[in-house]
Structures are given as C-alpha cells and as structure tokens.
Amino acid sequence: LRIDGYLHPVEQCPVLTPEMTDSFKNIATKDLRHLRAQIDNGGGGDFALTFRGMARFRVAVYKQKGWFGMALRLIPRRILSFEDLFVTSHLIPRIKNMLDRPHGLILVTGPTGMGKTTTQATFVDYILESPRHVLTIEDPIEFVHDHKNGLITQREVGVDVSSFREAVMKGLRSNPNVILVAEIRDLATSEATIWAAESGHLVIGTLHTTNAPETITRFIDIFPPEIRDQIRIQFSMSLLAVFSQRLLLRAGGKGRVGCYEIMVATPAVRNLIRERKTEHLASAIQTSSSEGSISFDAYLAELFRAGKVTYETAIASAADPKGFRELVEFAQRNRQH
C-alpha cells in the first residue's frame, strides 16, 4: 500500500497471483464494455469503481510481462473544506471571491498524485452552495457531487462523450455557469477551454506543471507558433489565477498537507504574459501578496510556523532553501520584537 507517498508492505496477506489480478480485472470491468476491448487489446485503461456503496476507487489497469496489474487509489468520501485545504486563512475569502466570478480561467496544477482533484472538488462543492449549474468533464469521474443549492452535471470521457474538447463544446449547449475540465492535455482541449472562458463561463482546468511560470509556458506552447502571440493576449485576459500544489508529509509523520503557490492574474501578471516575460512572474507573485498571491516558499513558511510540517521537511521541499531560511528567520525576529 502507498501511504503518505511511501510504499508499505501488507503483512499477513496472500501474494496476488497473475490469475487473481486477471480475475479481479474481469469482475471490475464487467459493466464497462467500452473499456474491455481497450484494456484487453491496448494494454490498459483507467476507470472509477464503487464498491458496495461503501468506497470509491480510481483504478488503473496495466499489462506487464503478459499479465494484468492494477493500481487502486481510494477516493475520499468527504470533500475537504477550505479550512482543511488552506493554512493561510486570510486567503480563503479571496479564493471564494474568485470562484464567485461569472467568467474566467482558473488553473490547478501539480505533479500526479499531489491533490489537484481534491482541491478542485472543494472548489466545485463551494460553487454548488449557490444556484449555479456546474458541468464537470472527467476521465474518469472521481468525486461524485451532490446538487446542494445548484445543479451538477458530471460527464465522463469515453462513457458520456468521446473527448474533452467535444464535452466542452457540446457542454456549452447545456447552459452551464461553470465548467471543470479535469485535464487539459492537447491543443483541441486548450482551444475549447479558452473559448469557454471567453464566452462567459468560469472554467477550472488542470495541467501537470509544477509552478505558475511553467504553467503559462506549457499552456501557450501547446498552440502552433504562428498564433501564440494572439493566444497570449486571449489567455492573459481570461486568466484569473494559477494554483500550483504539492503534498508534504505532516509533522508527526501521519498524513500529508498541501503546499500551494497561488498566482493571481493582476494587471502586472497579465502584462508579463502578453510580453512573453514569464521569467519575471516569480517576482510578480512576491510583490502581489496583497492581491492574494503567495509564493511556494512563503506558503511553506506558513506551514512550518503553524506546526504542520517539520523544519527538515520544509527545507528539503523549498524552491530556494537559502531564501526560505531567511524568510523563517525574519519572521522569528519580528515575533521577538
């Protein structure tokens, strides 16, 4: 089992044989006809599985050495609150205000397994407290949301629709206020995402990037070189914020806690994007803290001061270890005075 990012052997459990995993694969996919051929002939596939109404898993089936293996990730039953997610409580009203906007683009980014889906689920859960229609496009559907005071439509690529792009473009006809695109992975989806944000929708999307500057570069570079200048203009006008995140081991060794970099699209940030000066975005984040931006290391310092992570974990995770030390020492001197 992988617990808090590390693999742990399971004691007193029989070793799974290839025949057992193949049998489990057949049982798990018996109602997923669209996936059977892909898994059997293509060597793998991804889907969500609910077990007797008690637990829900994201399942990845893959082939190795001629036999099937599986990775099952437990999807939490409880959607986290903003207070659960963010140690920087003073930023929560700004984040909620962002999610109340009628249109624009919010990107949630980070490596695989770093909590992006959990953050998006919290965002969607908050939005549904108001009378708005939220359309989620996922592959597969992970968190299953209640309507609450709004309306939720959840579409799964490969089951309800053939692609992310098709889901976005056709989804516009279903009159959503908010569209969640669980993965922006290609040119067609990127184009549809920009179009949806420009046409009066709040769009929340995901990229597998580690920080805001890399996110901007990755998104723009998806497009052909001859139209990138125009895309920079459109993207800069639509962007509301980039949330980049990682999960760190909690102090005490049990559980993990999210560490965020938040870049709010201030006029200065929009101008840097248009002018192709992404190398200056890190400085723009530091100088726009009053607007709700926060650097990864500044957030890391907040986690350390709150006792959420140890100093050893913090210094090992810092983007700039030397700068992080100075940040912590400066805060300690201020408290003493």
What are these regions (language model features)?
Residues 1-337:
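Short, flexible helix-loop junctions that flank or precede catalytic/ligand sites
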